[in-house]
Amino acid sequence: MGIIYAIISGISMSLQGVFNTKLGEKIGLWETNVIVQLTGLILTLVISFFWGKGSYSNIKNANKLFLLGGALGVVIIFTVMKSIGGMGTTFGIGIILIAQLLAAGIIDAFGLFGTEKIKFCLHEFLGIAIMIVGIIIFKWKH
């Protein structure tokens, strides 16, 4: 099931990046960020109300660093819009994917933020290198 969720996430993130960039051209970058965060909040509140199984009272037991997810969302929306607006969808998302994979590799390799430490070996580095070469080939001018 994890693969299905990852595919849905990847498609959704690409669509969101394009939609946000296009909306930003009409109403402004920060205004779009507000709309995105607000609609996300409303939808999440409805879903949480009907199907939520957690407890907001447990937030006092959470690592306070992990509360920065919303602030990171603002950074993500801003930077995705600027990258897609400046480089186009495919190139922008390609660079984003490489950066995500590198960051995830570092998090795994060092077991950061309480995650399980997962070895990052030669074949992982080769995979990232192949992605980088792929982006270079993709943008190569004829």
Task: For every predicted segment, state its role.
Residues 1-8, 25, 30, 41-66, ...:
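Membrane-interface interhelical linkers
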Residues 8-15, 19, 64-87, 137:
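Hydrophobic alpha-helical transmembrane segments of multi-pass membrane transport proteins
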Residues 13-16, 100, 104, 134-135:
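Alpha-helical transmembrane segments of multi-pass membrane proteins
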Residues 25-29, 79-98, 114:
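Structural motif at transmembrane-helix junctions in multi-pass transporters
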Residues 35-36, 68, 95-96, 123-126:
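Hydrophobic core positions of alpha-helical segments in small-molecule transporters
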Residues 39-43, 95-110, 129:
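Alpha-helical transmembrane segments of compact multi-pass small-molecule transporters, enriched
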Residues 120-139:
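Hydrophobic transmembrane alpha-helices of multi-pass small-molecule transport proteins
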